[in-house]
C-alpha cells in the first residue's frame, strides 16, 4: 500500500529542491526527517512538510504503521514559471524567471524480513 502527498506551485527552483529530495529517496521515514532537519537548504522545511503530510495520509487513510514506512518515491517536477523584469542600464530590462516546483513524495510500508 502506498500513501502520497503533493505540494504544488511551491516557490523554489526545481533544481534546488532536487538536491534535497535526492537525499531522502529510499530512506526510512525517521531517517529522512533527521536528514531534512540537518540539511541547511531552503527546500528542507518545505520537503519536510510534504513528507509529514504523506506520513499522516498513510496513518489516517490507510492505517499503516509509521515505524515501517519508507520513502518509496520522491521527485520534483517543474511548475509554472513567473516571469519578471529587472531594470538595467540605459533604459533596458532583463527577464527574470522565478521558477516554481511540484514536489511529490510517496511512502509505502516496508516488507518484513
From Swiss-Prot:
Stored InterPro entries: Ribosomal_uL22, Ribosomal_uL22_bac/chlpt-type, Ribosomal_uL22_bac/org-type, Ribosomal_uL22_CS, Ribosomal_uL22_sf
Function: This protein binds specifically to 23S rRNA; its binding is stimulated by other ribosomal proteins, e.g. L4, L17, and L20. It is important during the early stages of 50S assembly. It makes multiple contacts with different domains of the 23S rRNA in the assembled 50S subunit and ribosome.
Gene field: rplV
Entry-linked Pfam families: Ribosomal_L22 (PF00237)
PROSITE patterns: RIBOSOMAL_L22
Intrachain S-S bonds: none
Subunit structure, as described in the record: Part of the 50S ribosomal subunit.
Family to which the UniProt record says this protein belongs: Belongs to the universal ribosomal protein uL22 family.
GO molecular function, one term: structural constituent of ribosome
Keywords: Ribonucleoprotein, Ribosomal protein, RNA-binding, rRNA-binding
GO process terms (BP): translation
GO cellular component, one term: cytosolic large ribosomal subunit
UniProt protein name: Large ribosomal subunit protein uL22
Amino acid at each position: 500500500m502506498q500513501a502520497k502527498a503533493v505540494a504544488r506551485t511551491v516557490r523554489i527552483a526545481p533544481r534546488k529542491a532536487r538536491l534535497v529530495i535526492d537525499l531522502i529517496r529510499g530512506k526510512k521515514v525517521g531517517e529522512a526527517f533527521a536528514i531534512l532537519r540537518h540539511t541547511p537548504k531552503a527546500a528542507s522545511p518545505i520537503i519536510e512538510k510534504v513528507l509529514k503530510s504523506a506520513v499522516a495520509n498513510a496513518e489516517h487513510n490507510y492505517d499503516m504503521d509509521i515505524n515501517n514506512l519508507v520513502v518509496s518515491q520522491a521527485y520534483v517536477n517543474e511548475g509554472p514559471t513567473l516571469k519578471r523584469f529587472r531594470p538595467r542600464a540605459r533604459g533596458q530590462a532583463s527577464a527574470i524567471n522565478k521558477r516554481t516546483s511540484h514536489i511529490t513524495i510517496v511512502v509505502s510500508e516496508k516488507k518484513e524480513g
